[in-house]
């Protein structure tokens, strides 16, 4: 990676795993899809991949490089706890290296209008943002959304320290100048009498709205 004026460094940053080209093999016993298409837009190319996610990303790169529109990842929060299926207590430099290796491939998979969502808590939030600024570009950071993940009840209510109830979604665009979010509207069964005006052409860009 090209050196920048401002960057996050850690022990072992220059160490890179050697990734050979990989292929994905279908397990016919576990595969299933409908025998027919309901519409012409139906897709039969969804995949559930079992294995190391770094190797899986590498295997997808040849076919999907520059094509992925949306990526959502939920990496280990590095809470210093040991769970049944994975260790969530990695040393910080190891965690950063693992994240860097995967995020670099994810960036190559994304198309120019793509969006990346990373779900994280406060343990590594600060380091993650700086790492993503370096990989995706600080100018491509869209937002950091805070959402309520829990409540100060139960065992948390007797915690003598600060109680954490929030998680975060860190959002980056592949190329923010051409990135456009999809607007979401919720239909109402009846007219909301609090409003006296209606947008007649809400599908248009907002400067062209007619009331």
Residue ranges, per PLM feature:
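DnaQ-like (DEDDh/DEDDy) 3′-5′ exonuclease domain used for proofreading
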Residues: 1-72, 79-94, 98-101
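Flexible, glycine/threonine-enriched loop-and-boundary segments that flank and lead into catalytic domains
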Residues: 51-54, 59, 149-151, 155-158
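Conserved nucleotide-binding/hydrolysis micro-motifs of P-loop NTPases
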Residues: 77-78, 122-125, 149-152, 175-179
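Beta-sheet entry/capping signal
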Residues: 45-47, 67-71, 113-117, 125, ...
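Conserved Class I SAM-dependent methyltransferase catalytic core
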Residues: 92-146
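Short, solvent-exposed loop/turn and secondary-structure capping segments
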Residues: 81-86, 128-130, 144, 156-157, ...
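Flexible, glycine-/basic-rich loop-and-beta segments that form/coincide
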Residues: 152-211
